[in-house]
């Protein structure tokens, strides 16, 4: 028997590959199937089952393409309803893979169909729990995402989650290894640990949600402090339930090279968003007017979903040479399949063609230090509120990037402000969005708070001084 965790940092997501006796199972696969196909071929095994822990909201699973290419059966937990062929398992149902077994544990709460998969080894020992979004390391799945489809409140779903965890998971042996679907950085939880696997015994000791005195306290703790989910989550759920275009077709369409004239014409005719995925430094120096920057060198896919929102938005790509396929692949993971092509030769080709360009007004933290001491200034901090509360520039306002589509209309076009994030990655995104919407009354700080913290600019770490602009 072999268990392999295939972890994707950009999504903080874990897929699992299990082999035994010439057969294999994959749990919660990503959209692109070729890496799995290659593993199967290398190991000389036949994929028998594709297990889905639930209808994922934060990414589009590869279950359909993988099933088409391997003839493996797709398995969901009880109550799941799909528009494609799938085995809807019963609670406690056993599936055999070679010499091992997988038992379905129906654990509703995060969603109604949410299920964990308990691995029983060749000797009959319960050895691993693939816990999906039911149990994370340090946290549990948020119970607010399925309210509409379940016709239940988040408190009612949290109550179901309590029953699932306390009656089905906690009675399991301490030595069982827990393999969750997500780790730190995922929007599917609020308090996840950085580790990607642990023993159930250690989680029983350290996970706050597993140490509540009763259901009421559990509901209160689990629902407290939940941030609104990204808008694209609902669309990803529908794609996972109903189906989607083949990844191969999406990739073929997205990898259409376009010379500047073609690129410009398609942008005008289609209304496509020009998405520039270069680093924030390269983008700030020069870019195609109206384009939006979300760099591949960071949490690319989640930010695309948070900022672009509509998965049906046509997209044209500007990338560094050789990064086109990675960009299309990572977009498809969160359901953005309408990539119409990429700018052949990248931004350099656009410049050489003599077409109009734009740039971000960016200054160094040293220059910012001089200016802040010379005059009264307005400062916008677009980091998460938790980062701001930990430490921030004295008198800075908190406006998290995740909510830019809500707060940008509050900006006074004639009032200048300085803007920063943690390192420059997020503030360049914000700058590109602001300039695309016609705002040019700001200066972005290179290197973000990390660089600013090395200067003498006054800082504060008192939460009571938080200034949040609605």
What role is predicted for each listed range?
Residues 18, 28, 54, 66, ...:
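Divalent metal-coordination and catalytic microenvironments
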Residues 26-27, 47-56, 74-79, 106-109, ...:
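Active-site neighborhood of phospho(di)ester-bond hydrolases with catalytic His/Asp-centered motifs
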Residues 29-30, 55, 79, 111, ...:
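Active-site metal-binding loops of divalent metal-dependent hydrolases
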Residues 33-75:
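Active-site metal-binding motif and surrounding structural segment of the metallo-beta-lactamase
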Residues 142-143, 155, 202-238, 242-244, ...:
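Rhodanese-like catalytic fold shared by cysteine-dependent sulfurtransferases
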């Amino acid at each position: 028997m072999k268990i392999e965790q295939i972890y994707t940092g950009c999504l903080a997501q874990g897929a699992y590959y299990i082999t035994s006796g010439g057969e294999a199972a994959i749990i919660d696969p990503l959209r692109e199937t070729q890496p799995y196909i290659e593993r199967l071929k290398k190991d000389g095994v036949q994929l028998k089952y594709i297990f889905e822990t639930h209808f994922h909201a934060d990414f589009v699973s590869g279950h359909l393409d993988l099933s088409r290419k391997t003839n493996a059966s797709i398995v969901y937990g009880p109550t799941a309803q799909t528009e494609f062929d799938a085995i809807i398992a019963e609670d406690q149902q056993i599936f055999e893979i070679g010499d091992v077994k997988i038992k379905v544990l129906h654990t509703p709460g995060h969603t109604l169909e949410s299920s964990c998969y308990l691995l029983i080894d060749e000797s009959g020992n319960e050895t691993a729990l693939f816990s999906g979004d039911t149990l994370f390391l340090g946290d549990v799945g948020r119970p607010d995402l399925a309210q509409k489809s379940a016709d239940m409140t988040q408190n009612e779903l949290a109550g179901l989650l309590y029953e699932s965890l306390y009656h089905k998971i906690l009675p399991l042996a301490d030595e069982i290894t827990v393999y969750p679907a997500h780790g730190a950085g995922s929007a599917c939880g609020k308090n996840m640990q950085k580790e990607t696997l642990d023993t159930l015994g250690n989680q029983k000791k350290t996970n706050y949600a597993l140490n509540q005195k009763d259901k009421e306290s559990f509901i209160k703790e689990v629902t407290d402090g939940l941030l609104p989910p990204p808008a694209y989550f609902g669309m990803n759920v529908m794609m996972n339930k109903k189906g989607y275009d083949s990844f191969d077709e999406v990739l073929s369409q997205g990898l259409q090279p376009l010379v500047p004239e073609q690129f410009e014409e398609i942008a005008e005719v289609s209304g496509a968003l020009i998405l520039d995925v270069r680093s924030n430094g390269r983008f700030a120096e020069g870019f195609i007017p109206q384009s939006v920057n979300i760099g591949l060198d960071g949490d690319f896919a989640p930010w695309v979903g948070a900022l672009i929102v509509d998965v049906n938005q046509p997209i044209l790509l500007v990338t560094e040479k050789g990064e086109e396929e990675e960009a299309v692949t990572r977009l498809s993971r969160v359901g953005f399949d309408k990539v119409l092509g990429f700018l052949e030769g990248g931004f350099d080709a656009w410049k050489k063609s003599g077409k109009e360009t734009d740039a971000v007004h960016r200054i160094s933290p040293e220059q910012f230090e001089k200016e802040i001491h010379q005059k009264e200034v307005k400062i916008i901090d677009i980091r998460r509120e938790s980062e701001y509360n930990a430490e921030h520039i004295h008198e800075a306002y908190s406006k998290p990037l995740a909510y830019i589509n809500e707060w940008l209309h509050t900006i006074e076009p004639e009032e200048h402000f300085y803007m920063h994030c943690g390192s420059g990655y997020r503030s360049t995104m914000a700058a590109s969005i602001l300039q695309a919407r016609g705002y040019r009354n700001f200066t972005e700080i290179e290197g973000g708070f990390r660089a600013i913290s090395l200067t003498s600019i006054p800082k504060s770490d008192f939460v009571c001084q938080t200034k949040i602009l609605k």
